[in-house]
Amino acid sequence: MMNRKQTVGVRVGSVRIGGGAPIVVQSMTNTDTADVAGTVRQVIDLARAGSELVRITVNNEEAAEAVPRIREELDRQGCNVPLVGDFHFNGHKLLDKYPACAEALGKFRINPGNVGRGSKRDPQFAQMIEFACRYDKPVRIGVNWGSLDQSVLARLLDENARLAEPRPLPEVMREAVITSALESAEKAQGLGLPKDRIVLSCKMSGVQELISVYEALSSRCDHALHLGLTEAGMGSKGIVASTAALSVLLQQGIGDTIRISLTPEPGADRSLEVIVAQEILQTMGLRSFTPMVISCPGCGRTTSDYFQKLAQQIQTHLRHKMPEWRRRYRGVEDMHVAVMGCVVNGPGESKNANIGISLPGTGEQPVAPVFEDGVKTVTLKGDRIAEEFQELVERYIETHYGSRAEA
């Protein structure tokens, strides 16, 4: 197990980031925040999927006015997930005009690159920090390379040009991202915001750039760090890029909260980004969220797609039931279920899982032995193998985790 970098803990409502706390999964809505009903629905969907913080855009007066109503409705429906307000350009004005918005949020996100331009930058940044202090809210100082503070970049470019051997431009840009975050954090502390109210992020869109920036940032501060590619992309590309970047950093003990910034397919479920974040952490052994289904990829021995459908059915069922099971069955998230397609690895993997089934491959007897804790307990046959195995999984959870449930 890797050793986590010790950072200063930051509390966001009931959630703790850093300071040795479990790595927090967060997400962001893509609704118009002024649409209270639509935003509430999506926040609840994300929270139900397992998001522990949900960020919402606060970009205009209508959005700022809606935030307290969103919080009130979430509370009414029993959803206590903290909301993070995402501010760009005009946050100082919105927080000044709508104090109820500030009170309803669990955290503010500030981008130093667009909090103000020229002579307005420092006063507007100071206003945002003063509101955070007034309402006792933590802040994420989130630097994005695509909206980098140009005054910081210009200063570092000038310094670089005076060197006998100037550094390459990409290296200077990476340093500018880090410098912007660290200097902004220092200014925030100078304005009265304690270190235990500050989270930092330095997001890039490239995997190698992100790794390089966070390795340097982590070595130069003990602030809690938020990890994520700023624009991961769509589909498998976005998932692979996020996994590649975050896994390298997490393996080094870097990172206290993560968000997977996937571009969703039109009409697709927004909660995919939550599932990907959870699966990165769970497959790395950093946290457990839902029982893991182990299944083989299939080959010429498994010309039927029966085992693939069963594996998908079981995984979907487990994830759907987890909000209920998490309350009733303590430890169920650590369970392993094997759904294997033939006799080559099927019995072995099934024995190593908490419960597993080895389905018949091509040319094998049409029977499916089931193993529980390494012991063969039953052999399933006929047309109801899928339904019967799902019932066995439910029974296993009830008998093995029911007694652990908290009163």
UniProtKB/Swiss-Prot annotation:
Pathway in which the depicted protein is active: Isoprenoid biosynthesis; isopentenyl diphosphate biosynthesis via DXP pathway; isopentenyl diphosphate from 1-deoxy-D-xylulose 5-phosphate: step 5/6
Keywords, alphabetical: 4Fe-4S, Iron, Iron-sulfur, Isoprene biosynthesis, Metal-binding, Oxidoreductase
NCBIfam families noted in UniProt: ispG_gcpE, PRK00366.1
Function statement: Converts 2C-methyl-D-erythritol 2,4-cyclodiphosphate (ME-2,4cPP) into 1-hydroxy-2-methyl-2-(E)-butenyl 4-diphosphate.
Cofactor stoichiometry and binding remark: Binds 1 [4Fe-4S] cluster.
A single GO molecular function term of this UniProt record: 4-hydroxy-3-methylbut-2-enyl-diphosphate synthase activity (flavodoxin)
InterPro entries cross-referenced by the UniProt entry: Dihydropteroate_synth-like_sf, IspG_bac, IspG_bac-typ, NO2/SO3_Rdtase_4Fe4S_sf
Stated name of the protein: 4-hydroxy-3-methylbut-2-en-1-yl diphosphate synthase (flavodoxin)
Record family assignment: Belongs to the IspG family.
GO BP terms: isopentenyl diphosphate biosynthetic process, methylerythritol 4-phosphate pathway; terpenoid biosynthetic process
EC number: 1.17.7.3
EC class (word): oxidoreductase
Record's catalysed reaction(s): (2E)-4-hydroxy-3-methylbut-2-enyl diphosphate + oxidized [flavodoxin] + H2O + 2 H(+) = 2-C-methyl-D-erythritol 2,4-cyclic diphosphate + reduced [flavodoxin]
